[in-house]
Design a protein with these regions (language model features):
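Non-catalytic beta-sheet/beta-sandwich ligand-binding modules that flank or precede catalytic cores
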Residues: 1-188
């Protein structure tokens, strides 16, 4: 294929338009970030501003009047074999947090199975979590940013809390994964 109707010219990123539907991933640009060719196969780079969850469908179309065959026939912008499901690149996300009535623990629900490394094995530990109460005006404080204990039931992790002082109900407990500590089965 060629960029000019007389059978000359190399294809460029501007000869293609990208789109995504479904899921949460967003394109950073509808124009590919790169292009390379090997034989009849063109590899286009896709710029995403957020990771794909695996339910998105990516579509590639030639831009109008930009792709030709040797005989000068123009490629249609409406293709039928130009879509593919994107791979899951989204790590486990927290979908729910419920604190115990006595403030001794918090249940953290993850959207999928989680592991402490990229080997898809092992159990999460207290070191995989970071806790905080960012309200500096509160008399309630955390004794440690690390949970005191951990237990698991399916994808619900119960983290033990060491709260000093008396909470008045206006505090916010923040639960985050420690840096580079919680992965899904696809090593995200």
């Amino acid at each position: 294929v060629y960029a000019v109707s007389n059978g000359t010219g190399n294809l460029e990123v501007s000869d293609f338009a990208l789109s995504i539907s479904g899921g949460s991933a967003q394109l950073s640009s509808a124009t590919p970030t790169s292009i390379s060719k090997q034989g009849n196969v063109y590899t286009l780079g896709i710029g995403l501003s957020s990771p794909a969850s695996g339910v998105e469908t990516g579509t590639v179309n030639p831009v109008a009047d930009s792709v030709f065959d040797l005989a000068g026939n123009i490629s249609t912008t409406n293709q039928s074999n130009n879509s593919i499901q994107l791979n899951d690149r989204l790590g486990p996300s927290i979908t729910g947090i419920v604190i115990a009535g006595n403030n001794a623990s918090v249940d953290v629900t993850l959207a999928e199975a989680a592991y402490p490394g990229t080997a898809n094995s092992g159990a999460l530990t207290v070191a995989d979590w970071v806790l905080s109460i960012p309200d500096t005006n509160s008399t309630a404080k955390l004794g440690s940013a690390t949970p005191t204990s951990i237990s698991k039931n399916n994808n619900v992790y119960t983290l033990g809390l060491n709260i000093t002082g008396t909470p008045d109900g206006n505090e916010t407990l923040v639960v985050n994964p420690a840096a580079n500590s919680i992965y899904d089965a696809l090593d995200n």
